[in-house]
């Protein structure tokens, strides 16, 4: 609908294995922010712009061979975020788990993770939190927010988990 926005799907994105194959650079939404819980809004506010910039940078990088370290890091983070956002058919993820995974990706906790291990990282991280700190999931789910105290706890958990995962 013209009043709510449009989602544009891209065959190149689809053919590269990314599902859903949404082109964030040209898709428009007026309701997206209103449909999100506060925790998601606070952590993913710049995600759409970051992904659009990543797509442009990735296209540019195909033509150049000498990329500086900052550009390489942006490309790596972008690829990780794309991997994080992939979704298997009939496999929805609860919002509290989405918040944790997107938070981890946007804040660099997966930067040292190889691209083919991102899914394993996600699975093991969510299991680790469910066993050791499930209260974070409950708080996000029940309040819809990622309070400062819980964000601090989440950072600590992520720091611990990354050390064991990358060991």
Model-found features: residue ranges?
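Conserved catalytic/coupling modules of large nucleotide/cofactor-utilizing molecular machines
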Residues: 1-167
């Amino acid at each position: 609908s013209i009043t709510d926005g449009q989602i544009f799907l891209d065959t190149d994105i689809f053919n590269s294995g990314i599902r859903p194959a949404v082109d964030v650079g040209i898709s428009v939404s007026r309701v997206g922010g209103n449909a999100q819980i506060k925790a998601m809004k606070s952590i993913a506010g710049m995600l759409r712009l970051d992904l659009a910039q990543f797509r442009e940078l990735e296209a540019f990088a195909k033509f150049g061979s000498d990329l500086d370290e900052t550009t390489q890091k942006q490309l790596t983070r972008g690829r990780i975020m794309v991997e994080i956002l992939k979704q298997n058919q009939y496999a929805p993820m609860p919002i509290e788990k989405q918040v944790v995974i997107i938070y981890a990706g946007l804040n660099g906790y997966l930067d040292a993770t190889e691209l083919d291990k991102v899914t394993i990282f996600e699975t093991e991280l969510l299991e680790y939190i469910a066993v050791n700190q499930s209260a974070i999931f409950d708080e996000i789910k029940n309040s819809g927010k990622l309070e400062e105290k819980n964000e601090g706890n989440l950072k600590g958990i992520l720091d611990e988990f990354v050390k064991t995962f990358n060991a």
